[in-house]
Amino acid sequence: MNQDKPYYQIVYAPNDIFKKQAEYIDIVDDNIRTIVDKMLQNLHIERAVGLGANMVGILKRIAVVDLHENNKSSPIVFINPNITYFSEEKQTFIEGSLSFPGIEASITRSKAIKVKYLDYNGNKQELAAEGFLATVIQHEIEYLNGKTFLDSLSKLKRDTLLKKMLKHIKLHPPHIHGSGCRH
């Protein structure tokens, strides 16, 4: 991982980092903010809506989310996020991941949640989210808890998707979009 670049290289599955719990952060300092800034750059470059720190090889409880609603960037930084409420009402979305390129799966999650976290400056926050935002937050925090969106699927479905992903990676090697990118 090149520390001089303004972004990180995405870690691709299969990788043991996705089975590990991310570590809590004691103090939000400039080092943590640098990690966040680079993660936000990844989000922008990859045109993604969410990213957990372990997806860039960092085992810290950090997630960034930006739904880009109305073509406007409104990033939310979650440091040490903890979901304190899950609604009983569920919703299903087709989910994918930068770390699992070329595959998607229908995943059912709580329609509404409440999450406590520290923001970019280390201030305590609480957010009530519903709909797609709630799904994205649950998806990213799941990564920090050592799980992925595929873990809720049957072994057969998961294995089929992983084979499809490996074939996709072979045909379309993942890369960071940039000035040398031709698409």
UniProtKB/Swiss-Prot annotation:
The active site is at E140. GO terms for biological process: translation. Pfam families: Pep_deformylase. GO terms for molecular function: peptide deformylase activity. It comes from the Bacteria. InterPro entries: Peptide_deformylase, Peptide_deformylase_sf. NCBIfam families: pept_deformyl, PRK00150.1-3. PANTHER family: PEPTIDE DEFORMYLASE. Belongs to the polypeptide deformylase family. This is Peptide deformylase-like. It comes from Rickettsia conorii (strain ATCC VR-613 / Malish 7).
